[in-house]
């Protein structure tokens, strides 16, 4: 019985660590590369993400759009949460954006980012 409990605890621990250390999110609204950045007077950054050349099986809101990064945005770099990230134009860095709330249905779309995962 003790062996089964230890095995169960070990399995749950491993699963939890694996789940929280994934660099790619399981759901997101848009993915692509940062192709432009803007900084407002408050120092908040907005990034233009272009994913028109990326194929994904996930249903996305858009393949091209602006994501506003605020103090409420959670940023993950290679699976680990970070306080900030110096967003620059880099075709080798893939980002995954989850929007927070409504998105302006223009093209490119515009909205506040709830979460951004960065694969660097």
For each feature predicted by the language model, list its residue ranges.
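Short stretches within intrinsically disordered, low-complexity N-terminal or propeptide regions
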Residues: 12, 67-69, 115
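Bacterial N-terminal signal peptides
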Residues: 9-17
């Amino acid at each position: 019985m003790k062996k089964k409990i230890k095995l169960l605890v070990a399995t749950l621990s491993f699963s939890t660590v694996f789940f929280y250390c994934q660099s790619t999110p399981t759901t997101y609204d848009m993915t692509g590369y940062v192709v432009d950045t803007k900084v407002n007077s408050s120092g908040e950054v907005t990034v233009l993400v272009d994913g028109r050349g990326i194929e994904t099986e996930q249903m996305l809101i858009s393949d091209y759009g602006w994501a506003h990064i605020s103090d409420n945005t959670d940023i993950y770099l290679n699976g680990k949460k970070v306080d900030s990230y110096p967003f620059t134009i880099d075709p080798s860095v893939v980002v995954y954006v989850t929007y927070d709330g409504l998105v302006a249905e223009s093209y490119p779309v515009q909205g506040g980012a709830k979460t951004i995962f960065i694969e660097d």
